[in-house]
């Protein structure tokens, strides 16, 4: 899945579950806009080469989630 946060970060990973604490992803790669580059380029690179795992597990608080879509539904 692709999870976008309200702060502009994007995560690509395996959706595990929604808990009281937020959305739990496993084997996720993260994009931070402050680090430079573009979200679209990050997603194109991930589609081409696969997920570069930055986080074995990451819990994103529900209040920070701006969107969640299946990776295959993206138009790259």
Q: Which ranges hold each PLM region?
A:
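Conserved RNA-binding domains used in RNP assembly and mRNA/RNA metabolism
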Residues: 1-76
């Amino acid at each position: 899945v692709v999870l976008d946060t309200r702060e502009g970060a994007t995560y690509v990973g395996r959706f595990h579950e929604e808990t009281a604490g937020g959305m739990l992803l496993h084997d996720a790669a993260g994009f931070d806009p402050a680090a430079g580059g573009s979200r679209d380029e990050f997603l194109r690179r991930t589609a081409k080469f696969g997920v570069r795992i930055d986080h074995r597990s990451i819990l994103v608080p529900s209040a920070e989630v701006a969107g969640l879509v299946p990776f295959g539904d993206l138009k790259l």
